[in-house]
UniProtKB/Swiss-Prot annotation:
Listed name of the protein: cGMP-inhibited 3',5'-cyclic phosphodiesterase 3A
Effect of residue 914 to D/A: Loss of interaction with SLFN12
Biased composition (Low complexity): 436-448
Gene expressing this chain: PDE3A
Activity-regulation annotation: Inhibited by cGMP. Inhibited by 17beta-estradiol. Inhibited by milrinone.
Cofactor: Mn(2+); Mg(2+)
Disordered, as annotated region: 1-42, 436-482, 590-640, 1023-1062, 1100-1141
Function: Cyclic nucleotide phosphodiesterase with specificity for the second messengers cAMP and cGMP, which are key regulators of many important physiological processes. Also has activity toward cUMP. Independently of its catalytic activity it is part of an E2/17beta-estradiol-induced pro-apoptotic signaling pathway. E2 stabilizes the PDE3A/SLFN12 complex in the cytosol, promoting the dephosphorylation of SLFN12 and activating its pro-apoptotic ribosomal RNA/rRNA ribonuclease activity.
Binding sites annotated in the UniProt record for Mg(2+): 837
GO molecular function, one term: estrogen binding
Record-listed cross-link Glycyl lysine isopeptide (Lys-Gly) (interchain with G-Cter in SUMO2), residues: 1120
Amino acid sequence: MAVPGDAARVRDKPVHSGVSQAPTAGRDCHHRADPASPRDSGCRGCWGDLVLQPLRSSRKLSSALCAGSLSFLLALLVRLVRGEVGCDLEQCKEAAAAEEEEAAPGAEGGVFPGPRGGAPGGGARLSPWLQPSALLFSLLCAFFWMGLYLLRAGVRLPLAVALLAACCGGEALVQIGLGVGEDHLLSLPAAGVVLSCLAAATWLVLRLRLGVLMIALTSAVRTVSLISLERFKVAWRPYLAYLAGVLGILLARYVEQILPQSAEAAPREHLGSQLIAGTKEDIPVFKRRRRSSSVVSAEMSGCSSKSHRRTSLPCIPREQLMGHSEWDHKRGPRGSQSSGTSITVDIAVMGEAHGLITDLLADPSLPPNVCTSLRAVSNLLSTQLTFQAIHKPRVNPVTSLSENYTCSDSEESSEKDKLAIPKRLRRSLPPGLLRRVSSTWTTTTSATGLPTLEPAPVRRDRSTSIKLQEAPSSSPDSWNNPVMMTLTKSRSFTSSYAISAANHVKAKKQSRPGALAKISPLSSPCSSPLQGTPASSLVSKISAVQFPESADTTAKQSLGSHRALTYTQSAPDLSPQILTPPVICSSCGRPYSQGNPADEPLERSGVATRTPSRTDDTAQVTSDYETNNNSDSSDIVQNEDETECLREPLRKASACSTYAPETMMFLDKPILAPEPLVMDNLDSIMEQLNTWNFPIFDLVENIGRKCGRILSQVSYRLFEDMGLFEAFKIPIREFMNYFHALEIGYRDIPYHNRIHATDVLHAVWYLTTQPIPGLSTVINDHGSTSDSDSDSGFTHGHMGYVFSKTYNVTDDKYGCLSGNIPALELMALYVAAAMHDYDHPGRTNAFLVATSAPQAVLYNDRSVLENHHAAAAWNLFMSRPEYNFLINLDHVEFKHFRFLVIEAILATDLKKHFDFVAKFNGKVNDDVGIDWTNENDRLLVCQMCIKLADINGPAKCKELHLQWTDGIVNEFYEQGDEEASLGLPISPFMDRSAPQLANLQESFISHIVGPLCNSYDSAGLMPGKWVEDSDESGDTDDPEEEEEEAPAPNEEETCENNESPKKKTFKRRKIYCQITQHLLQNHKMWKKVIEEEQRLAGIENQSLDQTPQSHSSEQIQAIKEEEEEKGKPRGEEIPTQKPDQ
């Protein structure tokens, strides 16, 4: 009996025995055949299969054979037409006589006089139909190659045939509609009408380069057919040529199907319609393998048939680039074998790279950020060049959990002194550069998942820490632990790689019945997010107790360092006596077993909390997104969440002591959107979506407050309006399922609820789709660009541009953000808006940090809520296949989309508000301004957009603004009550006994919303409309005065930054912006309220009124200066505002 490994080797290695007559074919047949295939037994006896198998397997051989055969047939026909092939003399004479008799009365319907028949030189002796047949075959060949080119460029077969149908329509219009005679079909008007019809169809279907080629070919074919097909009527000749073209395209489609596809070509059915043009920028695509010339050659010489890549370079594992089943089939049992060869670093190559970077640094035209990045790489290379070559054996991928192996850069090891940066170099480098040097290659530092330097402080040590703790084999869930993990060198090891390796193993084990996927905030799968996710698992949010409204209820709730996550597991390899289900901590995501109930029980309000004891731990990987906004405190990971799990005494100020957290439970059925998926009684309100003051609270009343479907309904309408369902082939049911589960996960709290998420989603949609005066777009005519996007890694629908159906402005004086932001990035912005406050507890980041909440410990006190929102929302997305509405995105697109969503959510942290505003102001005031072809600039614009949408309440009309103000104040008061019950100092504006509503809103507008709107407006990105001269003369009083204060100077700055000189003619024109008008009006309203309160307080006690009055007058003066000089940079105001934050 053959061993499976031997069978696999027989499949992969050439077979030298078997069929003696055709050894090559037999070898290929054995190589490609499936052992279980029924063809395997009969392939030896089928001589035709043995001969054709090499042709089918080799793309070059099949293409060469096809081209050669067609060329031979064409040459043969041409020679027959010219009479160069011998024929019977009597037949030639008979053909000549018949030709003379037929030519005597004249050709009916002919265009040019003269004899019919073949070409000069003996062609008349042949059959009179041979020349037309040869000509039609030539036209068929021409369209064959053109059709093959179109199909391989991504054009579908019906669209290609539709182009020729458009030509037929043009011919019918010329001959029947316009009444052009047969003698004038070659005239310029007739040809112009036909080619115009073809050009119109081409403009909608093809890119510019393909369209020009199609028009040129069709024009030439039409002319040749009208001149040369003399055996047919003139009116029939173009249709015969088009018929030959259809046959040629059909033949091309058939040939394309039988020829093997290239590895880089995407499936034709996934390209979609080409109605949306693509972008100009080149999108990098993952290659299957990267090699270093000298290193790989040395490796191959030392280990014969085994080839290795340089593990010092980052690489995406193959199992992420293809399905697990395909990867397992390709690698076979050999994938688990370990090679003990060493990895060498070529010092000469590093020296050459250092020299190239030094030459680049000598260029004075490089931007400062590029120079800084290159200087960082140069310093790293120069440091490594002082050391000898590093030899480090590869780690055996089969790692036993009982070995307690550790591979963390932040811990002591024998190789750390060689790999880490010397302390003398760390002291000599500036902090910003040091953070860049220590960064890791992950999705945080690269939007597309490729290795690029990111100026954000991403620390390598935090993202590369992996620990495999010792676990007894008798653990109840030991079968669920990853037992095989491929580890690369620590310098290139990332969290995304570690998790993907673990998930690859877990996917195999969890494919068995009863296996459940473990959801953890730390996991971030890189490949298809739902591979390996069983159908029996679900993450469901169930709120045990809502936030209390008084201190009495908060004092009665239970304590717990872990939020227990219990579920039942079943596995085939579990022993029957194990009945205790494992418990998962929902804060850190790791399983732990419950200890003895008698061991130090903590009882409060009748609830006993047992101290957990850790028995098992899977690979721990800290998320890269935790370090986006970090300070320069330390490069060593602190496992505070692990310490929190083992901590027995609970502090009084713990967040768990104040409220019962939501429990995540694994259920048998997912949360699915109810029927009907789209509610049909909301059309009257949904028609107002294109207004800034959308009546969202009226929509809540119509839907029903207890229904909770507002987010999914509005999301569907906005996605459908933008055409995103068609552009990305989004399945509607999965889309509605996820967004319904997402809105259910929002808690019923006063402000940060599903209504707020819907309002933010509507705001970002409005800011990106409505007309913006003076904004130039990178595309024209709604999606038509140049033909320079054919090398892009994405299809047109994915990297093209989408427009709202409500955007019907044809004036080039207006533009919109959706014309500058690709569709994938725009959809990521919308999804981020829907996710951005998911599972918000109704407390601020400062409160969670002060009370040492589990989330604060998990995310190291940095952007705690924002990290939690993103992690929880993505965990929900990856928990069920019913939620995967991004199923048609490939690996690179999904990684890019996930990166954009997370970055947009993290940007909503108000602690980083002034940093974003200052960075954006610097970009706007730069000579170049916003470069829409730069992905980083577009990301910054999207971050500013979602920040403005998140705090858009003061920019709404008075009625909506007061409703939102009531919600945030009530939520603040609940936090103040809890702080008082815990003995903590009450945060400003959160004391229910001393309300300061007017001061809160006035300060928030003056210091937060005002500067943000000012920066956004100064960049020329605020929707509005030009104020015509007639409107200016008709306006009086307030509107015009307010417009003179703010938008007029702003338009000067906008026009100066525009590249087009035409915009300078509108330098003096005014812009009416509804958003800024509401902001100014609401600010004036709160100032009047403050003045009235001060006046009433002054009547009672004049002496106590002096200090607050002077302080308020300073704030009022500051906002007046802002209104009058809105176009000026606000750099001098920011330092005075930060202390107020």
